[in-house]
Regions:
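Compositionally biased, intrinsically disordered low-complexity regions enriched in proline and serine
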Residues: 6, 19, 78, 155, ...
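C-terminal accessory segment of soluble enzyme catalytic cores
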Residues: 147, 166-218
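Cytochrome P450 core scaffold surrounding the K-helix E-X-X-R motif
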Residues: 51-59, 163-176
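N-terminal lobe of the biotin/lipoate ligase/transferase fold
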Residues: 1-140, 148, 216-218
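Conserved phosphate/anionic-ligand binding catalytic regions in large, soluble enzymes, centered on
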Residues: 150-163
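Residue-level detector of alpha-helical segments with a strong bias toward transmembrane helices
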Residues: 89-91, 161, 166
Length: 218
């Protein structure tokens, strides 16, 4: 099927139910696989929800209800005060194989570079995620959990941008760590989206912010 779009798309979904959004992601993955749409970035917030991935360890969330998914990683929390980014991207193949690790490193770099535009020095370390600070003041401010279907990515990145998100993490061991490691950074949501679009565009070609209806126009 012909891709009639002239650029990659960035779409702000506002707040959306987790399972509804997961269904939407999978539809976009199918459409990206047949080249009827370009690469798409979804920006959004979920109502409070706990999810877990392929490294699921029930000891990290006890009796809390969680949604089990096909993404990488262990249990995490999504809710108000967090910007979620789901990149529906066709990953380039290297020697006939999908280079997932290089893709993850690239996404980490995009988040780090975007945060740097606001004066935050973020980094990756031995533990999963993106961190700011040093020593006892070191806090995890962004998490990543991806799934790849036939070379197209979905699920993605969450960045904590409001203090209220920390309460949700306090009920679990996020990614197997004590919840006290979680932190947040105060950044205007729209400003952060614009910074991310700019850096994603440098890495994957230009993205333009469009309305949701753009995806359904004939």
């Amino acid at each position: 099927m012909e891709n009639r779009y002239t650029s990659n798309l960035a779409i702000d979904l506002g707040q959306i139910d987790y399972l509804e959004c997961l269904k939407f992601q999978k539809d976009l993955v199918s459409r990206r696989l047949n080249n009827s749409i370009p690469d798409v970035l979804l920006f959004l917030e979920h109502p409070p929800v706990y999810t877990t991935g392929r490294r699921d360890d029930p000891s990290n969330y006890g009796s809390i209800d969680v949604i089990k998914t096909e993404r990488g990683g262990d249990v995490t929390y999504h809710g108000p005060g967090q910007l979620v980014i789901y990149p529906i991207l066709k990953i380039w193949e290297k020697e006939g194989k999908i280079d997932v690790r290089s893709f993850v490193v690239k996404l980490e770099g995009i988040v780090i570079k975007s945060l740097a535009t606001f004066g935050f020095e973020a980094s990756v370390g031995d533990e999963p995620g993106i961190w700011i600070g040093n020593g006892k003041e070191k806090k995890k401010v962004a998490s990543m959990g991806l799934a790849i279907e036939n070379g197209v990515s979905y699920h993605g990145i969450s960045i904590n941008i409001g203090k209220e998100v920390l309460e949700g993490f306090s009920r679990i061991n996020p990614c197997g760590m004590d919840s006290s490691v979680m932190g947040y950074i105060e950044i205007d949501r729209d400003d952060l989206i614009n910074a991310l679009i700019s850096v994603f565009s440098e890495e994957f070609g230009p993205f333009e912010m469009k309305s949701l209806t753009t995806l359904w126009k004939s």
